[in-house]
């Protein structure tokens, strides 16, 4: 899934991957060392390397496409919420608005923190936290994820 997210991101602009294992980073992406203090700190480490508009896109979104990311960026200050109320992606025209509010109910916390618009972009809605989440994706898998799972096109 990370490969699909990076590929879609590179088609739109830069791709930074915050990780403690640089061997998993696909070609073309920049590695940012994960400070090891949770998702909020990881995102802050990545944002420290970005001037201007940033898209924060979780790596467990196998249906993401370049068109979806362009649409998301065009939404301005926006978030893509998962069905469970967590946050799958943030669009930050000004990265300084970021606050580490991830976790259960994070979409509501982000909206309370700043005037985030909630976007309805199907490719950003479904994250894969469990095997059952894959059933929701049907034909929306990216090419790398499809190949990894050996799902026919």
Language model regions located:
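Active-site acidic Asp-centered loop
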Residues: 57-59
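Charge-dense polyanion-binding interfaces
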Residues: 143-153
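Short, polar loop motifs at secondary-structure junctions
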Residues: 17-24
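A structural signal for isolated positions on well-ordered beta-strands in alpha/beta enzyme cores
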Residues: 14-16, 55
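Conserved core of the sugar-phosphate nucleotidyltransferase
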Residues: 61-139
